[in-house]
Each structure stands twice: as structure tokens, then as C-alpha cells.
Amino acid sequence: VNDEKSYPSRLQVKIASAGFPHKVVNAGVSGDTTAGGVRRIRWVMKHEPEIVILALGANDGLRGLSVDEMRKNLETIIAICREHNARILLAGMKALPNYGEDYMRDFEAVFPELAKKHDLIFLPFLLEGVAGEREHTHPDGMHPIASGYSIVTDLVWKRLEPMLKK
């Protein structure tokens, strides 16, 4: 998907159209894990964000990486955001069943647990209505195409707009 059809670009359009002065800084890296997010979060904080959309973990799940390590990485990112007074919108992810039911259950439980523990605004599943829907994804059934990014943008906006009003 070209940059202007990506969800960060679409989100910027929604923000501007609603009259908010906020600027989206796309710190996402395709294929990245929560460990990569830990390495990048200090750079992100140099932009002095008011709000961080924390949407990491899907690639940890695709690779079958340790759920405990993912949780620890997300906790580190949350702590650093809090040190810089950035509010957080946490987007949940789902795991594929190929690593077994226990892994899937443990993986998916991390996101609501962290949202509750840290009192975060929470979007239960970033790709709701997109993942597994061939008309909204690349042939892998996971990565969104333009129509999928439109859905993702709307999902994020429902949680983000009230945060922008505060």
C-alpha cells in the first residue's frame, strides 16, 4: 500500500478534517516486533507525543516469540511513554492457532491485562473486520490493503477522537 493509503496517513486526514492540530508521526516498521519497539521508543519520545498508539505484538505472535518477553517489552514501552507524559491507546492483537491454543490464549490475554493494569484506552483487536477477510487483505489474509486500512483507521479513530478532545 502506498503511503497515502496507509492507516497513519488516513488517520492524519481524519485528525485534520476534525479540526485538531495534532500531527501523526508514523514510527511503525513493517515486520517489527515489540523488541524493535523498545529500541525505537526513545526516538519516538523526541517528538514529544501527547498520544502514542501502541500497536505492536502481531509479529511476535507470527514468529511464536515468548509471550512473557512480549509482555515485558510492552511494559517497557508503556513505562517510557508514561515518563514522558504521553497517553496511550493500546491496540490488541490476535495470534494464529499454529502455535497451539495455550500460546494463543496467553498471547491474546496480554493486551487486555496491560490495558487494565495501566488504565489505558484499549482497542481489543486492531484488525477487527480485516484479518482473514480476503477483500481487505493481501493474499496472506493478514496484511491490509487500502480497504482494510480504511477499516483500521475507523477503528482507531473511534478510540482516538475522544482522547484528542481531552
PLM regions with names:
Residues 9-20, 36-166:
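Alpha-helical cap/lid subdomain in secreted, periplasmic
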Residues 20-33:
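A short beta-strand-loop structural module common to alpha/beta enzyme folds
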Residues 2, 29-32, 65, 144:
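Short, surface-exposed alpha-helical recognition segments that flank or form part
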Residues 1-7:
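Glycine- and acidic-residue-enriched helix-capping/strand-helix junction motifs
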